[in-house]
Regions:
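N-terminal alpha/beta PP-like core and its mobile active-site loop of ThDP/TPP-dependent enzymes
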Residues: 2-348, 389, 393, 480-483, ...
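Generic enzyme active-site microenvironment
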Residues: 167, 310, 405, 458-459
């Protein structure tokens, strides 16, 4: 019927691939990540022709992690394109990561010809069922006429309420159907006009809850403001700064909340975390969940009498945690309303308030202890010596500050304590799920989202290995990314087994946690025209950082670490 319409109209024909690309471009998509192949290669090419930059990866997992991080960094859904069947399955890594972190992302996969479903078609899979645990909303365009509405729906649902992943299924037969160019435009306009605007509207804030929150903070003796990546996603930094500085309340960021207010701010309680959460009597938690990262908001880490004020865009999250007060709303909007309410009747703890002094004194004490350790130049490297050198180099870049990507066990844990974030959305790490393998995908997303910033990845050798082949992607697109690999020869280090542990018929095999000693990771990127460095001393590392930061070209710095440095499972030894 579509072909007959085209014949009558006389206008050029548009196939399903082109209509998907047109709809994506009209919906504001300007970047896509993915791996092409049957049946979506033409779709990628048509999108590029319409002005959408397509970043082609080697593996859908890394591409999916890139799409999820791009959604977080830009506030617009990151789009992942995959082939059918196994390509869609590989894409679930990124989709599930987006769901866990509440980041907007759209997974688009080709699928089997509908006439062959159930007969063992090429890469056949019930992909709608496969994505269900991780997708807020899924659509299948069963006819070319349904493509525009399906595209707009998955885009809108990705950002609606609590952001997350959505899925669009494109059967191969639909991608080859055609309509006239005029009909394609009519379908797109119809889909645009039919968008549910209420879906993407921010929730209305209950003003009485704002008043109650201010009263709780006003009466508190030891208040604390906690904010996370939800506040970063909402661009709440200006409101948070005004709120903190007008009230004098100390603040504690979650790992990816770091930088919303500078780690060097006088009211930052990061270095006094245990004291801050253990003694506060009222905690305003903005865009952060009381999950394992926050010890579930329970004793003994938190006081049994603490009163939580939870600010979250998702009512279900507040209902789950049962705080003293919950405010459903966009983090930026809520914080600004809190500040306005306080501004009309101000209060401030002041620099000499006992609670503020206690936090500052503990911060000073703990920072001094850390600096003593950082001042030691230990060779062979432990984790602290190279981390201090990296910290100083990153701070030396100035503004705009580099985006830091951090993954690993000990590498990420030590980096969280040592590396300093001074600007919003400049730290990406394993996140809510503690996902390993995100590093190179995150680097690529950061470089594409913020081309004016240097991207610096500080990776354990295990974390790097998940996505190491994507250094070719860095080189192919000439992205300003410096990857620093902490090479200690294994998942947590080299072979640390006692002799009495090495038994059984395969005792000559390497330990399950160990890699090839002295692996030349820096040579990998040289195969693709990038620059590699080997650094085993402070001077070698300083020189490599200075040169690579100045060049802003794809680089891998292989930092050799004592295989016995660090602890198994990092700070989560009790879980292993």
């Amino acid at each position: 019927m579509a072909d007959a319409d085209q014949e009558r109209s006389g206008s050029p024909e548009v196939d399903g691939n082109t209509l998907v690309a047109m709809s994506l471009a009209r919906a504001g998509v300007d970047r896509m990540f993915g791996v092409v192949g049957i049946p979506v290669t033409s779709l990628a090419n048509r999108a590029v022709a319409l002005g959408v930059r397509f970043i082609a990866f080697h593996n859908e997992q890394s591409a999916g992690y890139a799409a999820s991080a791009y959604g977080y960094l830009t506030g617009r859904p990151g789009v992942l394109l995959t082939v059918s069947g196994p390509g869609c399955v590989h894409g679930l890594a990124g989709l599930s990561n987006a769901a866990a972190n509440a980041w907007p992302m759209v997974l688009i996969s080709g699928s089997s010809d509908q006439s062959f479903i159930g007969r063992g078609d090429f890469q056949e899979l019930d992909q709608i069922a496969a994505v269900k645990p991780f997708s807020k909303f899924s659509a299948k365009a069963t006819d070319i006429s349904r493509i525009p509405a399906s595209v707009f729906s998955v885009i809108d649902w990705a950002v609606a309420g609590r952001p997350g992943g959505t899925y669009l299924d494109l059967p191969s037969d639909v991608l080859h159907q055609t309509v006239s160019e005029s009909e394609a435009e009519r379908l797109i306009i119809q889909a645009e006009n039919g968008r549910n605007k209420e879906l993407i509207e921010k929730p209305r804030i209950n003003y009485s809850e704002i008043q109650k929150a201010v009263e709780l903070l006003r009466k508190a003796q030891r208040p604390l403001i906690v904010f996370g990546k939800g506040a970063a996603y909402a661009r709440a930094e200006n409101g948070l700064r005004k709120l903190v500085e007008s009230t004098g309340i100390p603040f504690l960021p979650t790992p990816m909340g770091k930088g919303l207010l500078s780690d060097t701010h006088e009211l930052a309680a990061t270095a006094a975390r245990s004291l801050a959460i253990g003694k506060c009597d009222v905690a305003l938690v903005v865009g952060a969940r009381l999950n394992w990262l926050m010890h579930f908001g329970e004793p003994p880490k938190w006081s049994k009498d603490v009163k939580f004020i939870l600010v979250d865009v998702c009512k279900e999250e507040i209902d789950l945690r049962k705080p003293s007060l919950g405010i459903v709303g966009d983090a930026k909007d809520v914080v600004e309303k809190l500040h306005k309410e306080i501004k009309d009747d101000p209060f401030c703890l002041g620099k000499t308030h006992p609670w503020v002094e206690a936090i500052k004194n503990k911060v000073k004490e703990n920072v001094a202890k850390m600096e003593v350790q950082l001042a030691k130049e230990v060779v062979p490297f432990n984790f602290l010596t190279p981390m201090k050198i990296i910290r100083d180099a990153i701070l030396g870049v100035g503004s705009p500050a580099p985006i830091l990507v951090s993954e690993g066990a000990n590498t990420m844990d030590v980096g969280r304590s040592v590396l300093v974030q001074t600007e919003p959305r400049t730290r990406l790490d394993a996140g809510t799920w503690g996902t390993m393998g995100v590093g190179l995908g995150y680097c690529i997303a950061a470089a594409v989202a913020s081309p004016d910033r240097l991207v610096v990845a500080v990776e354990g050798d295990s974390g790097f290995g998940f996505s190491a082949m994507e250094v070719e992607t860095l080189a192919r697109y000439q992205l300003p990314v410096v990857v620093i690999v902490f090479n200690n020869g294994g998942v947590y280090g080299g072979d640390r087994r006692n002799p009495d542990e090495i038994t059984g018929p395969y005792k000559k095999d390497p330990a399950p946690t160990s890699f090839v000693p002295g692996a030349a990771y820096h040579v990998l990127i040289e195969a693709f025209g990038g620059k590699g460095y080997l650094a085993g001393t402070p001077d070698e590392l300083k020189s490599a950082l200075a040169e690579s930061f100045s060049a802003r070209k794809p680089t891998v710095i292989n930092v050799t670490i004592d295989p016995y440095a660090g602890a198994e499972s990092g700070r989560l030894q009790h879980k292993n």
